[in-house]
């Protein structure tokens, strides 16, 4: 298949310091090595799917209701567990963690959005130059494995495609060649089909025998709008399950994880349950005492209005940091306040890119900056459902084939992370 160069990443030489430790990479006859882990080259087609926003409750309700016959069968025929996502529980840091097998402290991407302290500008974290290490995908492609990264959201394309010489494109901006491959026009960015298009593209690559290792990253449009058990959620998840079944029919090992869960963050009357933290702290401590950055911010504003349960707070030089943190912690709905170094240590985030302090909402509370900065009209009558905090850290961790005894023991005795999925899929199945 020939792809429009606009949707294929460059083929620059791999960068990094070879070695056995974090951020080193090696290539061996049947292995690659990255960030302290060795990965076997796939013995059969291997497909890792990040089901964006797939809170475990969708499976807990959907499997008994017959929504997930294929994925439900992995309880008997494969491995069916839970893992912890990286913090904060947003799309970019977790997708990059999954494809590097490492937390944000190693790869450098700790949000969708950050404040550049040197320039004072707020910046979208979509540039692969912000990444601090290579990806499993790039190293596998460099070792001769036919590798593809397909994402629903174009914001992830450059990050996932860092130094990747294989196929890399998004359904959001699919080229005419990709539309021809899949057999239909690219979907609307606010649709369930944005995700299904990704899965269908992956299926086509396997049917054509043009892929050995695929990473397929979906969109959480449906999960933001529809709770577990809602008809629209069930219809969407049945469609995902059908496509997972087809991948298995084609002989693939399938691994499924999520980048985060999802929780209702609305009041009983349906109004969003939001703390506008910048407004609150500046009212108490004076104008411009703080600047609040919402790292959930991305182009998909209709999903969440840039409201999640994790924010970064930058204090003015004249502000009393301890007093600001104490005031934030006293607000109902705030679950945790940590200074920047402690947040980086506890949540494995890069300390040099951290704020003065971070504030996390509880499972049912979103935190914003100022009311004027958040447009909630896109919710269009839906309850606010979002993510970012500790309440959305538990995610599915599923494999279509059973684990070896060694990896079964690991799964039972250590804390599983969503970014363990490539290790388990490539090294740990029977």
Which residues does each predicted region cover?
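Beta-strand elements within well-structured catalytic alpha/beta cores of enzymes
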Residues: 43-59, 74, 98, 140, ...
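Secreted, luminal/periplasmic, and some membrane-associated catalytic domains
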Residues: 44, 51, 90, 114-127, ...
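Low-complexity, intrinsically disordered or signal/transmembrane-proximal segments
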Residues: 7-8, 15, 27
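Active-site-proximal N-terminal segment of extracellular/periplasmic enzymes that hydrolyze or transfer
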Residues: 24-79
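His/Asp/Glu-rich, glycine-adjacent segments
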Residues: 4, 21, 99-227, 233, ...
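A cross-taxon signal for low-complexity, glycine/charged-rich
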Residues: 1, 18-19
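Low-complexity, glycine/alanine/valine/leucine- and proline-rich hydrophobic stretches
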Residues: 361-411, 415-423
